[in-house]
Amino acid sequence: MLLKEASITESLNSINPGEYAKVGQILSRGSMRRRLLDIGLTPGTMVECVGKSPAGDPKAFLIRGAVIAIRSEDCADILINQY
């Protein structure tokens, strides 16, 4: 698989099922930041959007071999480089 790094930083909300991104920065604070770090969502981590609920929120992401659902409001605080 060939990946081309985008130069624009967006939020994790911007990727759709089948798209990849690399985590750039996590803006969340407190317990939410700790939860995201605990599930392996750290800067530099590759993430794939693998699905979304019928309503569009939450989306499911493949993170370090585990599928994790993240709400849109939390995705907005995760900045990424899309591939």
Describe the residue ranges of each PLM region.
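Compact, glycine-rich, soluble single-domain proteins
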Residues: M1-Y83
